[in-house]
Amino acid sequence: MDKDFLAIFNAIKADGANADYTKRGIDPLYSVGAGARIVVIGQAPGAVAEETRIPWNDKSGERLRDWLGVSRETFYDPERVALLPMDFYFPGHGRSGDLPPRKGFAEQWHPALLALMPNVRLTVLVGAYAVRRYLHLKNSDSLTTVVRDYDAYIGRGFFPLVHPSPRNQLWMSRNPWFEAETLPVLKAQVNAVLEQR
């Protein structure tokens, strides 16, 4: 790991807000590289990711890779694709899924990490937390509308998505345009960025 990236990694571990995780031997879970051309900003690692120490190592990750049109090898190559969740630790289980990422976490750590990745050309925002934070939206703004209007954000280097969780299968069935119209554009964007010299 590059010394600048390592310094941030160690600072995250040393931060008092993460002391409970550090005491339990749990490191922050994200993947970055100076050469990354795409950054995927998701919610927070799930229980499987925390256990295996591999981000997006579940059914949601399989679906996301399919949406992006990339292999597992490409997805986990930090010099091509950076994986930067809104919280680098599993926040625990809630009533209807995982708890949300902690407030203020992304604001504290993302800027320094993104500054070390000057080649990023596309930021894929996965789920409501990432979409609202990076597109500066209100909680009242409809995620479905934002995702449908993806072309309004491509020029700014962002591509908003719903979360690929199996729990969103009903949303997928109610919004067939997503698979038919949006995903082909996403795949083309990802491919174009990765193929750029």
Language model features with spans:
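A polyanion-binding, active-site-adjacent surface
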Residues: M1-R148, A152-E195
